[in-house]
């Protein structure tokens, strides 16, 4: 069951990534790989959010967590494309842009992950008076 769920979720994640890559082409922003950056940032957010949600809901089946985190989010995000795009930028002599891309990917991903974690926390109500 878990293999099928991971496969189906992985297919969906890959298709969503492909579709977003078509919507945000790199050429539209001076060759900066904004599409991959956006995908990896949102994937970092989603992985943290889902991780917290599954931890807080132990009744949810374990296969669902694996399908969502490893299948969907794992196929949606892409470290290999990040790496290839950095190499391509460096081969074009755009070392500064490659460095910005690496830094934005790392620090933006960490920030997005923190935001996903924070967004999944229970809402805290302030007392009156």
From Swiss-Prot:
InterPro entries in the cross-refs: FluC
Annotated positions binding Na(+): 74, 77
Cross-referenced Pfam families: CRCB (PF02537)
Substrates-to-products reaction catalysed: fluoride(in) = fluoride(out)
Signal peptide: none
Sequence intervals crossing the membrane: 19-39, 95-115
GO cellular component: plasma membrane
Single GO BP term: cellular detoxification of fluoride
GO MF: fluoride channel activity; metal ion binding
Keywords of the record: Cell membrane, Ion channel, Ion transport, Membrane, Metal-binding, Sodium, Transmembrane, Transmembrane helix, Transport
Regulation: Na(+) is not transported, but it plays an essential structural role and its presence is essential for fluoride channel function.
Subcellular localization: Cell membrane
Membrane topology: Multi-pass membrane protein
Protein family according to the UniProt entry: Belongs to the fluoride channel Fluc/FEX (TC 1.A.43) family.
Purpose of the protein: Fluoride-specific ion channel. Important for reducing fluoride concentration in the cell, thus reducing its toxicity.
NCBIfam families: crcB
Protein name: Fluoride-specific ion channel FluC 2
Origin organism lineage: Bacteria, Bacillati, Bacillota, Bacilli, Bacillales
């Amino acid at each position: 069951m878990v293999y099928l769920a991971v496969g189906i979720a992985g297919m969906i994640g890959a298709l969503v990534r492909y579709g977003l890559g078509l919507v945000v082409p790199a050429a539209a922003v001076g060759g900066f790989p904004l599409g991959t950056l956006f995908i990896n940032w949102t994937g970092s957010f989603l992985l943290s959010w889902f991780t917290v949600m599954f931890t807080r809901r132990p009744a949810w089946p374990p296969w669902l967590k694996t399908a969502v985190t490893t299948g969907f989010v794992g196929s949606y995000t892409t470290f290999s494309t990040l790496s290839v795009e950095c190499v391509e930028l460096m081969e074009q002599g755009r070392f500064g842009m490659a460095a910005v891309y690496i830094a934005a990917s790392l620090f933006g991903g960490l920030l997005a992950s923190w935001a996903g974690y924070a967004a999944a926390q229970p809402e805290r109500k302030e007392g009156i008076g």
